[in-house]
Regions:
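Transmembrane alpha-helices of multi-pass inner-membrane enzymes
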Residues: 55-60, 237, 243-244, 345-349, ...
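Hydrophobic transmembrane alpha-helices and their immediate junctions
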Residues: 230, 334-381, 404, 410
């Protein structure tokens, strides 16, 4: 029964996507972040929901009267498209081309849907709905994981929807870390039952992240919570409440969780931690051999380890490890051009958020932009911190932030300059206001 309900909901949304592509984009975001089909039991799990939803959005764009062309020209989008070019080049010269092209298709879908989001997001209402769908979809797994973690006393590991990019414990930890700023800031903007729902998802996401047993996720969680409190108008009561809550919670936290977190300070004695350091050395050796094109997607194999790091195979009894680092993974897979494009994309997003906050100072009708810029900056910071220890460089959310930031820049510049014709839009008003 559950399968029929999920499939029916998706199929019924397809005509909406054709005639109202923005709402089709919301359906796509819901599917991509909540994975409702993974909550079913049989045929819905393999039903191509995301593909059909994306096709309906693309079909709807054919009938769309206009597109947000100005947002596409923003530097964040340019860096993202340059990054996609390096994906393509690295796949042409990949060590394992058959595997690389399969992965290239998956990542190209992420980039394509981010471009479509840039085209479709045009005003505050649309950005709010888009971000709200993302927050509630990922937040659902925080709600579910938090209840599971508390019910089991933290003695079992919290996982995400399997099989998906968010399925592993490290992966769902990163996704929730990135989502928590959204839940917090959106709750400050909403009212009634929606505000309470967002707050519930936020607070249950804390034990959900903790009981993934991911040290990187716990570290990012601590940073996110600290910055949320420091940025709040009620920082003193929040910090006091967090300290008291933490002290009261310690007796109920499993000893094995505390022991695992303590290995952060004794990483030299931890096999898992040292394997990551050794694997980064392995990645650097490959990057030196493939500086311009990279080794391509999914380059890890026993044969490559035997060539570049045979001593690590001996050290870890023949086990082939993942990169466990978004930056080393990009560098090794796509070379230095891909690495610089990836870093620039993130830097441009962070800088633009700062410029947006500076630009809207004193503009009472644009205060909401500061809220969105704050939440996106914190979300990206969580991505960078947690990404130092996990492979999530192709996760959808950072690329969707590119779309949202580009659209926010267009909206702010349009409002500050009084020019409402996007074809005649220039970025000068935003940059001038931010200086």
């Amino acid at each position: 029964m559950r399968d029929y309900v999920v499939i029916g909901l998706v199929l019924s949304s397809l005509p909406i996507g054709l005639f109202r592509p923005f709402y089709g984009l919301l359906v796509y975001a819901w599917i991509s972040y909540m994975y409702p089909h993974m909550l079913a039991w049989s045929m819905a799990q393999t039903f191509p929901m995301a593909k059909l939803s994306s096709l309906s959005v693309m079909g709807g764009l054919l009938f769309s009267p206009s597109a947000n062309v100005a947002a596409l020209r923003q530097r964040e989008n340019v860096a993202m498209l340059l990054l996609w070019c390096t994906f393509t080049i690295s796949s042409v010269f990949a060590i394992y081309p058959d595997q690389a092209w399969v992965k290239w298709q998956d990542t190209s879908k992420v980039i394509l849907m981010s471009v479509l989001a840039t085209i479709l997001l045009r005003d505050r209402k649309q950005i709010r709905l888009f971000v709200l769908v993302i927050a509630l979809s990922i937040g659902f797994w925080g709600f579910k994981g938090g209840l599971f973690g508390l019910a089991t006393g933290g003695n079992q590991i919290v996982y995400g929807p399997e099989p998906s990019i968010m399925g592993a414990n490290n992966a769902i930890g990163l996704a929730l870390d990135m989502c928590m700023p959204l839940l917090w800031y959106l709750a400050s903007q909403e009212r009634g039952w929606l505000k309470r729902l967002l707050q519930t998802f936020f607070f249950l996401s804390i034990p959900a992240v903790m009981f993934t047993y991911s040290r990187g996720s716990t570290l990012a969680l601590a940073v996110v919570l600290l910055l949320i409190m420091l940025k709040s108008k009620h920082r003193i009561p929040l910090i006091f409440a967090m300290v008291i809550g933490g002290v009261l919670a310690v007796p109920f936290i499993p000893q094995k969780w505390l022991e695992r977190q303590q290995t952060v300070f004794t990483y030299g004695e931890d096999t898992s931690a040292m394997s990551r350091v050794d694997n980064w050395k392995f990645c650097w050796r490959i990057a030196q051999d493939y500086p311009l094109t990279g080794a391509g997607f999914d380059f890890q194999s026993r044969q490559i380890f035997e060539k570049y790091a045979p001593e690590f195979l001996v050290k870890y009894n023949g086990k082939v490890w993942n990169t466990h680092n978004i930056f080393f993974s990009i560098l090794t897979s796509h070379g230095f051009p891909g690495f610089f494009a990836f870093v620039l994309m993130i830097l441009f997003c962070m800088i633009s958020c700062t410029q947006l906050k500076m630009a809207v100072r004193g503009a009472s009708d644009l205060v909401w932009v500061k809220t969105y810029a704050d939440m996106i900056q914190l979300s990206l910071l969580a991505f960078v911190i947690n990404g130092m220890f996990v492979n999530m460089e192709y996760f959808d959310l950072p690329y969707h932030w590119v779309s949202v930031i580009a659209c926010l820049k267009v909206i702010v510049s349009r409002e500050l300059s009084g020019v409402h014709d996007e074809e005649s839009y220039v970025s000068a008003p935003l940059e001038a206001a931010a200086t």
